[in-house]
């Protein structure tokens, strides 16, 4: 294989491995890490990478969740999933309806809200005194679905919601992995229905599965020795990064 083809493939596999490990130990990050870096470096077409990420997320959950299902707050996950599924479609339709300037302004506002929430939570990483009601998980799912449909980023509202709960880290991780598995399943089925699961996607996903499985097992076996407070700070730090990444392109578009 020629170097100009091999290097992007190896780079993508390395990113998938790193993102999978991060998601296994925190419950999120695979899609955000891989999509963010690959789009910035141009390692592969965005549509192809998105389809590959959805497929390997299923492999990640298949290895990360066995033996840990008893830790999942099923009511919270169900409420979030119910909110996510229809709002993804709404997000896509809203983005198609809005003008480019309105969409840019909305992206700026969403980035500012996520950045503020991440900063506020990072400064006070202690969890809430008691679990939030199921309705708040539904609302976080709705906003997560809207973000996914409009900007391809569903994580921030869900990360903020689950990491503020008085849950053990393992409970938060497993719940988020399951929620994102539901989202990835829907995306994969929709991609298949649209005929987007072509040979390139299937080959790259097949190559990535062993990498994802190994990274998942490493995450389960050798998680970083972080305290719950540190883990929450890491999660909220990622939210800060996501908020900034949404704001900067929007600001650039307005300035230029």
From Swiss-Prot:
Coiled coil: none annotated. Induction: Induced by the C2 sulfonates taurine, isethionate and sulfoacetate. It is a multi-pass membrane protein. Could be a sulfite/organosulfonate exporter with a wide substrate range, including 3-sulfolactate and 3-sulfopyruvate. The chain crosses the membrane at residues 5-25, 33-53, 76-96, 103-123, 142-162, 172-190, 199-219, 236-256. Belongs to the 4-toluene sulfonate uptake permease (TSUP) (TC 2.A.102) family. The keyword Cell inner membrane applies. This is Probable sulfite/organosulfonate exporter TauE. One of its GO terms (cellular component) is plasma membrane. It is found in: Cell inner membrane. It holds the Pfam family TauE. Keywords: Cell inner membrane, Cell membrane, Membrane, Transmembrane, Transmembrane helix, Transport. It comes from the Bacteria.
């Amino acid at each position: 294989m020629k170097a100009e083809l091999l290097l992007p493939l190896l780079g993508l596999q390395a990113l998938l491995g790193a993102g999978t490990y991060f998601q296994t130990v925190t419950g999120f990050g695979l899609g955000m890490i891989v999509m963010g870096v690959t789009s910035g470096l141009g390692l592969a077409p965005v549509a192809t990478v998105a389809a590959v990420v959805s497929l390997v997320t299923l492999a990640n959950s298949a290895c990360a969740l066995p033996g840990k299902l008893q830790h999942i707050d099923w009511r919270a996950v169900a409420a979030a999933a119910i909110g996510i599924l229809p709002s993804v479609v709404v997000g896509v339709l809203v983005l198609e309806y809005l003008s480019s300037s309105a969409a840019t302004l909305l992206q700026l506002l969403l980035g500012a809200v996520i950045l503020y929430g991440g900063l506020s939570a990072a400064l006070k990483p202690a969890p809430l005194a008691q679990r939030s009601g199921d309705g708040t998980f539904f609302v976080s799912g709705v906003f997560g679905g809207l973000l996914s449909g409009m900007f391809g980023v569903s994580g921030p509202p869900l990360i903020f919601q689950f990491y503020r709960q008085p849950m053990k880290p393992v409970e938060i991780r497993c719940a988020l992995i399951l929620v994102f598995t539901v989202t990835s399943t829907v995306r994969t089925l929709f991609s298949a229905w649209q005929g987007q699961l072509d040979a390139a996607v299937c080959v790259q996903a097949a190559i990535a599965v062993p990498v994802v499985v190994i990274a998942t097992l490493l995450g389960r076996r050798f998680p970083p020795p972080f305290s719950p407070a540190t883990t929450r700070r890491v999660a909220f730090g990622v939210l800060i990064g996501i908020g900034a990444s949404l704001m900067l392109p929007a600001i650039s578009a307005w300035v230029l």
